[in-house]
Amino acid sequence: MTTATSSNISSKLPSIRGEIEANAPLAPLTWFRVGGNAEWLVSPYDTEDLSDFLKKIDPSMPVRVLGIGSNVIIRDGGVSGVIIRLPRRFSWVKREEGNRLRCGGSTLGMMISKVAAAESLTNLEFMRGIPGSIGGMIRMNAGAYGGDISKILIQVTLVRRNGDIEIWPVEKLNFAYRYSELPEDAIVTEALFQGQPGDKDKIEAQMNKIIAEREASQPVRSRTGGSTFKNPEGYKAWELIDEAGCRGLKIGDAEVSTKHANFLLNLGDATAADIENLGEEVRARVKAKFGITLEWEIKRIGHKLDGDKA
């Protein structure tokens, strides 16, 4: 345990074998590098530790999960309650019979695709182009380059808010475009994926193509949260944003990327409010021009500061 004293923690939260930090800065844990602190940041030792913690914690205590922070805005006022962040101990991949890969809940899609290539397993190449850990990828049915999670997932192990450990088959998640019925209180600790035998050289060539295309078309080396808005049915969000005159639009140090209009950037000193306000301005302009309401793909969590517009 760090930051808070043991007595202070024990009066508020049950003990764990992992780590608990009070008033923990969250900005360094997100790709935008903005936002306030978590009241409590909890890193469980393993699935059983997480389950035991959730069984003992006050049911009224708010609990949320944070992955690698690639598709989220933490608001400037911080987050009340507990933020669960699975540590590196949950990042692993192993091959199982039947051309399957099992991985831990904090494993990056990039890592899974690399292991799949090393094992000459195909159909997982698209993960190479998606920033994020597996829990968030499952929740939003992440996809790119012709693939998505729903096409390869077999089952998922999750821990519920009451501490129950459950295994859900893919059918129970009722996947749709950028959507799943994974419960809001669920924390993914393991996932099992189905690969297919393939040619290692072809798999690696496809992954290299994905990397090159992503580098050429997206601001991957900037402080960004990935795709900001979902594509409305029949449209591409970036085209609507571009045609509404939003490419390069700025609020404070937040900017609509000139490289890909569906990406928002922190140019250096943006606040979470700057970024969220910019996103809302984009939504307003697209609505005014096309009558289409863009739906946020990026999650926004936490409290706004007094006076914030967003």
From Swiss-Prot:
Coiled coil: none annotated. It catalyses: UDP-N-acetyl-alpha-D-muramate + NADP(+) = UDP-N-acetyl-3-O-(1-carboxyvinyl)-alpha-D-glucosamine + NADPH + H(+). One of its GO terms (cellular component) is cytosol. GO terms for molecular function: FAD binding; UDP-N-acetylmuramate dehydrogenase activity. PROSITE patterns: FAD_PCMH (PS51387). Pathway: Cell wall biogenesis; peptidoglycan biosynthesis. The active site is at residues 178, 227, 297. PANTHER family: UDP-N-ACETYLENOLPYRUVOYLGLUCOSAMINE REDUCTASE. Belongs to the MurB family. Cell wall formation. This is UDP-N-acetylenolpyruvoylglucosamine reductase.
